[in-house]
Amino acid sequence: MLNLTERLEAKEQALHQVDRTKKYISGARKFLGEGKIGLAIERYDIAEDALESANYYRELLWKLSNDDPTQEEFEAICVVESMKIVLYKLAKDLSGK
């Protein structure tokens, strides 16, 4: 039973950190649009930290599921992975490339 509790907690934490990542990416994009590059970079850094935390919980969830996650767990894992692409695109926009 402990494993199921741990899996649920890992999934919830991963999704919570994804929500934080989205929040700070949104803030970074807002400031970037306003030409406030310094503030945009600060928000990017926070988003990057949140995504790093989400990735930790994604890896933990994968480990706890013994490489056989439920559909709901797999979707959470995929959300974390997709946020890596979103953050990468923001980094490109911040660098002007």
Residue spans of the language-model regions?
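Long, low-complexity or tandemly repetitive, helically biased scaffold regions used
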Residues: L2-K97
